[in-house]
């Protein structure tokens, strides 16, 4: 595959995001809907796919102590700046939160069960009329904007039922046409200057980690760091990763670099690699190449599991990606990288997702531990053999199988998780 296609996909799949991307997506949708209509808000209706609803259900809103779909939608309409994309709530103020709390009776959330992929629709009614926005397939991919039933903007084909994917999704799906040896060849041979931009994710996610080490969230990252000696890059990796996620899910007003639409994915896919780089004094080029490998494997799996799913994509998909990157940084090559992925597939695939919340750092820690274990096993030629569980004869089928466990495998599980969450909130 042409290197430029791969680089273009990597660029498209990584972007800054403030807070967990599902509430950010809801806020962006309502911000855009309000932007086109203006006036005094009478009511807001949000229609979201089950996965997006679940992930935003108990997740903190950046810069506030508030959580959930309703507050995300209200704050998006009240103070959101749609031009900032997934950072649309960057300018939030205390008075905006106070105003939103008085308007909770004006918000209605509806779950759209019969839909494929990510979906969020905002209908904002004011004294000026109705503003409507639809986001599809990617968290910031606005495909329709209406003002009083007049279409102001519409992406071609994105609302056609015969076309299930936006152009961005089609481009990313090309990754699944690659064999693992082609992926590794790209990582080894692409000019460093062409992938140096990947290091932007390190700068951003490291700042978030430093914020988390103040003890935000459940304080897991800070706890792990307290028992980490100077040369232990594994515990250091866990501490960096968990502290960043602690900060993110608790509403810290510091952005993460997302990948495949998730800040937690972006954190897990990068910070363990930074830990190795720092402790082993490796150069930035090696780090960038390992991030490229981590991202590509993550994207590959997510193309089969879906952007949002019943399993914890952060630990499973991003965890498998970073396991390959870890193996690469520790001297592994194609055979060892392949065996690392087999080991990961046989370990934590199937870990459930209960939405973005304070427990995310626990799952992330499990994912990072499994990633290091899988890589170390592979480097010692210890591997789960083909035809054992979901490990297939080809590594490409094995990565596909990881995704298949989530979709269609765990669709009923996802429904039951959501039912439990809704029942528990009453």
UniProtKB/Swiss-Prot annotation:
Q: Name one GO molecular function term.
A: L-cysteine desulfhydrase activity
Q: Which Pfam families match?
A: SDH_alpha
- What are the disulfide bonds? none
Please give the InterPro entries that the UniProt record associates with this protein.
Ser_deHydtase-like_asu, UPF0597
| GO biological process, any | L-cysteine catabolic process to pyruvate
Q: Which HAMAP family does its entry note?
A: UPF0597
Task: Say which family it is in.
Answer: Belongs to the UPF0597 family.
The protein depicted here goes by the name UPF0597 protein CLI_1810
